[in-house]
Amino acid sequence: MRFIIAFLMILNQGFSNLFSLPPEDIIFESSYEVAIKKAQKLNKNVLILVGRDIKENLIKDFLNSFTNGEIIHKVSRKSVFLVIDKDNEIFNKINLQKSPTIFFVDSKNEQIKAAYVGAVLSSVQFDKDFLNYVMGAIKSTSVLKKQKDYEINTADERTFFYKTLKGDWRLKFNGKDRKLVLFDTDLKEFLVFKDINENKLYAIPKSRIGNIYFSLLGNEEWKLFGKIK
């Protein structure tokens, strides 16, 4: 009888520690570039854990938020995990409203597709919309909190400007990603970007309301590019 009780105590201890260590099939990275490249190679996406704590605590809290082991394994099959903690070099570039925050990034174009804001220990697994998106069950971008922080859509939904986690702006146009850089002009009410591969400029109102315009470099004639949705 004592043997059975002792065995059950050991078994119970084993289950309680199940999520204190990362499962073998979960990849945790500390470098954005490494995580993106690995995700692209493995045909996965990137889940980014951002928080005002050390890496080990963020990982522990994240894993402990899943009482169902099947869910975390499903998420891990679709994702490479990047941990950005208080010691990470790009942490101070992120305006974090709540800690921790989780971002889901499409590795194909480095676009932030969804965000979970709030304490991880409040159980991420119960945010069904976020989990369904991460696991590929739904494609709606309505999950994204404060979407305007990361993406500017035009009335033509196939064309949009978006911001990567590193702070770079890009333009998705005609099925292609175009890299943009900020361009200094006299248009104080607009953010003006230059396409690094073409001599084109794009002017987006800082209010993010109204129209987007484009012009050829060296030509002050601005033409309508699209209406902000």
Curated annotation (Swiss-Prot):
InterPro entries assigned to the protein according to its UniProt record, in alphabetical order: Thioredoxin-like_sf (IPR036249)
Source organism per UniProt: Borreliella burgdorferi (strain ATCC 35210 / DSM 4680 / CIP 102532 / B31) (Borrelia burgdorferi)
The name this protein goes by in its record: Uncharacterized protein BB_0066
Top-rank taxon, per record: Bacteria
